[in-house]
């Protein structure tokens, strides 16, 4: 049962991200480099947040449970703010790299657009964030006959997996909206990205009341997904065009196959 829970939760948590990586990133070496570099930036932000939280815990009264819980909330907020600061720093770095690539190309154009960089960097932040948030839970899931931890809900592992999937997608959407806001200098959009990130992080403290945390987080995920879709230039008309193109391609394949001469026996 432990192995089934482990693999099931792993596929739920990282299935969408793995599919996005294979379809949109793995085939382009430049995107893979941006993905790895983005993960490094997120790790540095986590390291700094951990140092801040570690210092605060050791300079305060560790026997005061309420104080320590408050420090945990404060540490989560600091971590969110540092992640967004490093997202901005990564945007600046990619902007410089984009200008350098454009100057080196023959036609004066960069081989990758800012929107593509935003998507890949957001995906990198999401994947590494998901790995660090759920890896210990998945390790505990491998235990023999594990259903819950210390009498917690039997849905603990499954809800954690769905929460991780939402966080990964949110980071992807945040990256797209954040980079676009930086390009157009829309400071209100930057504020909404940071605010939604803080809200999502705060909602996780409502666990194990999963109805009060998971449902609002997925509502935020859907909202940010629609915003990122529109920001990237998507619309209902573009969806219709993509569907029509697929239908036309399918019809062409059918016509071609129908016109082929059957092989002689």
From Swiss-Prot:
UniProt KW keywords: Endoplasmic reticulum, Golgi apparatus, Membrane, Notch signaling pathway, Transmembrane, Transmembrane helix
Membrane-spanning segments: 3-23, 32-52, 69-89, 119-139, 159-179, 187-207, 214-234
Major location (coarse): endoplasmic reticulum
Membrane topology: Multi-pass membrane protein
Protein task: Non-catalytic subunit of the gamma-secretase complex, an endoprotease complex that catalyzes the intramembrane cleavage of integral membrane proteins such as Notch receptors and APP (amyloid-beta precursor protein). Required for normal gamma-secretase assembly. The gamma-secretase complex plays a role in Notch and Wnt signaling cascades and regulation of downstream processes via its role in processing key regulatory proteins, and by regulating cytosolic CTNNB1 levels.
Highest taxon, organism lineage: Eukaryota
Subunit structure comment from the entry: The functional gamma-secretase complex is composed of at least four polypeptides: a presenilin homodimer (PSEN1 or PSEN2), nicastrin (NCSTN), APH1 (APH1A or APH1B) and PSENEN/PEN2.
Ranges per topology, Lumenal: 1-2, 53-68, 140-158, 208-213
BP-aspect Gene Ontology terms: amyloid precursor protein catabolic process; amyloid precursor protein metabolic process; amyloid-beta formation; membrane protein ectodomain proteolysis; membrane protein intracellular domain proteolysis; metanephros development; Notch receptor processing; Notch signaling pathway
Keyword ATP-binding (UniProt): no
One Gene Ontology cellular component annotation held by this UniProt entry: Golgi cisterna membrane
Compartments it resides in: Endoplasmic reticulum membrane; Golgi apparatus, Golgi stack membrane
Tissue: Widely expressed. Expressed in leukocytes, lung, placenta, small intestine, liver, kidney, spleen thymus, skeletal muscle, heart and brain. Isoform 1 and isoform 2 are nearly expressed at the same level.
Topological domain ranges for the Cytoplasmic compartment: 24-31, 90-118, 180-186, 235-265
Protein name from the UniProt record: Gamma-secretase subunit APH-1A
Record Pfam families: Aph-1
GO molecular function: endopeptidase activator activity; enzyme binding; protein-macromolecule adaptor activity
Family from the record: Belongs to the APH-1 family.
PANTHER family named among the record's database cross-references: GAMMA-SECRETASE SUBUNIT APH-1 (PTHR12889)
């Amino acid at each position: 049962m432990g192995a089934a829970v482990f693999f099931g939760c792993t596929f739920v948590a990282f299935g969408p991200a793995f599919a996005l990586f294979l379809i949109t990133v793995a085939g382009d070496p430049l995107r893979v480099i941006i993905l790895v570099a983005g993960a490094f930036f997120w790790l540095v932000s986590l390291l700094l947040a951990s140092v801040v939280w570690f210092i605060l815990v050791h300079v305060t009264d560790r026997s005061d449970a309420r104080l320590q819980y408050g420090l945990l909330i404060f540490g989560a907020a600091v971590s969110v703010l540092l992640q967004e600061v490093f997202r901005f720093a990564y945007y600046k770095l990619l902007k410089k790299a984009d200008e350098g690539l454009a100057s080196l190309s023959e036609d004066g154009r960069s081989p990758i657009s800012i929107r593509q960089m935003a998507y890949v960097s957001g995906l990198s932040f999401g994947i590494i964030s998901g790995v660090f948030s759920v890896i210990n839970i998945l390790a505990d899931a491998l235990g023999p006959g594990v259903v819950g931890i210390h009498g917690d809900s039997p849905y603990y592992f499954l809800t954690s997996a769905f929460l991780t999937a939402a966080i990964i997608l949110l980071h992807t959407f945040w990256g797209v909206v954040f980079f676009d806001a930086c390009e157009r200098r829309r400071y209100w959009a930057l504020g909404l990205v940071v605010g939604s990130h803080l809200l999502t992080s705060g909602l996780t403290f409502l666990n194990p009341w999963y109805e009060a945390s998971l449902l609002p987080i997925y509502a935020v995920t859907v909202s940010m997904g629609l915003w990122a879709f529109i920001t990237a230039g998507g619309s209902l008309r573009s969806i219709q065009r993509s569907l029509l193109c697929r239908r036309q391609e399918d019809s062409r394949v059918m016509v071609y196959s129908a016109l082929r001469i059957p092989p002689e026996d």
